[in-house]
């Protein structure tokens, strides 16, 4: 893992931030068997691709942190791995890796489908209201994902 971050730091000195983020999307997607455009679409919808974005507006008192808007509910588990809120705000590739791991957990639970994508934002809880929120979020991701795929062609 240290080798990966060393390469990212080296690349950041040689390339623009957009190209470094492209490396981050690809690296995380490869590690978790995801599409890089899906991760980028999530980051775009979640934070507007802002590395230091913080959202304090969650109804349950949690906050969302960084590029991938990692919910603070994950911090106790992440802290055991040496991942702090400050690192999520200052290391965009780390935010992408953590976001990809969270999405991969939902995919493992629900399959590679829009329920898993919607759970990234809304959580997996039951109920028709939460299901509607998951669906609405997944539709926003789908629109952005399609635009990214079209750009690639």
Put a short name on every predicted segment:
Residues 4-14:
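Sec-dependent N-terminal signal peptides
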Residues 20-153:
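Catalytic glycan-binding domains that act on GlcNAc-containing polysaccharides
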């Amino acid at each position: 893992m240290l080798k990966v971050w060393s390469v990212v730091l080296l690349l950041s000195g040689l390339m623009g931030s957009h190209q470094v983020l492209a490396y981050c999307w690809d690296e995380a997607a490869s590690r978790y068997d995801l599409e890089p455009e899906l991760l980028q679409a999530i980051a775009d919808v979640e934070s507007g691709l802002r590395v230091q974005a913080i959202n304090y507006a969650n109804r349950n008192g949690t906050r969302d942190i960084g590029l991938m808007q990692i919910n603070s509910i994950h911090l106790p588990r992440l802290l055991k791995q040496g991942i702090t809120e400050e690192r999520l705000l200052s290391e965009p590739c780390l935010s992408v890796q953590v976001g990809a791991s969270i999405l991969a957990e939902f995919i493992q639970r629900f399959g590679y489908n829009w329920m898993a994508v919607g759970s990234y934002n809304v959580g997996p809880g039951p109920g028709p209201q939460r299901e509607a929120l998951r669906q609405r979020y997944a539709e926003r991701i789908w629109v952005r994902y399609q635009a990214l795929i079209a750009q690639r062609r």
